[in-house]
Every structure is written in structure tokens, then in C-alpha cells.
């Protein structure tokens, strides 16, 4: 029987006014690239934009993981590693907080808090354990664009309702 260790993490979209979060178990031996794909799936993102992952220690970036060597040029004063070559197990449980930022234009910050380790995990894939709230659609304009979007979607008499509803459907967004 397959047994491994899992990391139990809670991932919140960093919103001021809403709770959007997922609790997930992930195998201990995954890379930060794998974590990126897991978060994309959990929040219904389409992997259309750049991203990075920071390990945070005492509210400072300890290490930043990026997609490619070209991305390293933007952060010359930090410890930068390639996410595809870096395993989570090398950093957890020493560090308890990560920040996953997706789409630098909309700036979706996901706060990843490490809750605990599960020693008898019997899967080689991630499992969503719990969650709350709908994820925003791609390219909605960040947090405040999402609030505007929700106001329009809730008001069928709004002049932009039909257009916004059609756009939401094209983004596979659901209420």
C-alpha cells in the first residue's frame, strides 16, 4: 500500500471583503511547479498569466520561485530559484507561509498557510478537503474589478448586465 506524507495547507485569495479559500492535502515530494498547477485547478484559473511563489519568513521574502531564468533578472536582491527544480519538502515545515501571486496585472495574491503534516497519506495527488467562495474569472480587473463584476451580475437591470453575463459564461464562471 502506498503511503507518504502530505502537507495540509489553507490557501486564501487575499481579499478585503470576501472569503475565498481552499484547504488541500498535497504530497510532500511535489515541486513548486506542481503547487502552481494545483492552485490553478483549485481556483479555476486558466494558466494564462505569469506567476511566482514566495516563501515568507517574519513577513519578509526568504526565497522566491519563478518560472524561468529570465524571470530571475527582476529580483536581483533576493534569493531566486526555479520552481520546476525546487521541492516543497526542502522548505516545509521550516517555513509556514507562502504567497502565490498569479496574473501580475490583476495581482491575485494567494496566501498559503501550512497547517500541518499528515504522515499516513495514501495518495500521490492533491485532494481538496474544504473551501469557501467562488473564484473570480480571468481578466476581471483584480479585486475591485471583481466587486464591480459581482454588482453587475446581481442586477439584471444594469446596462452592462447582458454583456457581462455573456462574458462571464465565456470565462466558464458560475455563481
Enumerate the language-model features and the residues they cover.
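Short linear regulatory motifs enriched in tryptophan with gly/pro/ser
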Residues: 1-175
Amino acid at each position: 500500500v502506498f503511503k507518504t506524507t502530505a502537507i495540509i495547507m489553507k490557501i486564501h485569495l487575499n481579499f478585503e471583503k470576501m472569503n475565498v479559500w481552499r484547504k488541500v492535502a498535497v504530497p510532500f515530494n511535489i515541486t513548486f511547479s506542481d503547487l502552481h498547477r494545483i492552485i490553478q485547478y483549485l481556483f479555476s484559473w486558466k494558466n494564462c498569466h505569469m506567476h511566482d511563489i514566495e516563501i515568507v519568513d517574519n513577513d519578509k521574502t526568504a526565497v522566491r520561485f519563478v518560472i524561468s531564468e529570465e524571470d530571475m533578472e527582476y529580483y536581483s536582491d533576493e534569493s531566486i530559484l526555479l520552481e520546476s527544480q525546487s521541492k516543497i519538502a526542502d522548505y516545509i515545515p521550516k517555513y509556514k507561509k507562502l504567497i502565490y501571486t498569479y496574473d501580475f496585472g490583476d495581482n491575485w495574491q494567494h496566501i498559503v498557510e501550512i497547517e500541518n503534516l499528515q504522515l499516513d497519506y495514501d495518495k500521490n495527488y492533491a485532494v481538496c478537503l474544504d473551501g469557501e467562495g467562488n473564484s473570480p474569472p480571468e481578466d476581471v480587473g483584480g479585486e475591485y474589478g471583481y466587486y464591480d463584476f459581482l454588482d453587475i451580475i446581481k442586477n439584471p437591470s444594469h446596462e452592462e448586465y447582458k454583456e457581462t453575463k455573456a462574458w462571464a459564461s465565456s470565462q466558464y464562471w458560475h455563481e
